[in-house]
């Protein structure tokens, strides 16, 4: 493989796990193909370091927009990742040691090829913990593993939600009110360790807004509306995406976050 020929390597979960209706990885791959790039796809378990090179046993894949089977595997090849044009880190959490190890390996070649997002920053800015930088712009929020702290938080705000610090996609979100017993919360903490707790905002039933930021520029937004009877708006949990526009306040907040993301070399957010 020639150095920096038009190749995009995608580090992701199993190809079969891609949801063609909701997964932006597919859209990125299709656009790369339209621009003449070959696509190689691999999972973190395929990463290998030998001397100073990082290899991945990768599938050369062609993606399709309108076919029943949205991809075909053309070839299986061990590639030197430093010779690709771009590497897209697209695997979902959990933010575990496998995830972290992959960032260390990719960091070794980050000066030889463009990795999106930067593996050092991905490791040091996990999504929910990164929000600590913007607590003044958020509903009341705490991070804790203490049942007593959660009870105090619940007493103050009546209705709260808790979610795993390193979770994603609206999974394992728990609504808590005065009738939620300690045993249930303790069991949750035992399973998920440190959690993020927030004051519950009733207006979530009308939806939230997902803002897309590329290179520090706000590119668009959607409103995600929960299923009837749900408080979780994530599309992967049954939420529906509709067109929206940002209010002046939302735009002001988004610009603050976008500026910080650009400073920290987070290209896609």
Named regions from a protein language model:
Residues 3-9:
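Extreme N-terminal starter segment of soluble prokaryotic enzymes
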Residues 5, 16-143:
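Conserved N-proximal alpha/beta basic substrate-recognition cap immediately N-terminal to
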Residues 10, 88-89, 198:
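Redox-cofactor binding/interface segments in oxidoreductases and associated redox assembly factors
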Residues 12-14:
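Extended, domain-scale alpha-helical bundle/helix-rich regions
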Residues 42, 264-269:
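Flexible, glycine/charged-enriched surface loops at secondary-structure junctions
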Residues 136-158:
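Rossmann-like NAD(P)H-binding beta-loop-alpha module
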Residues 148, 155-158, 166-264:
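Phosphate-binding site of ATP-dependent enzymes
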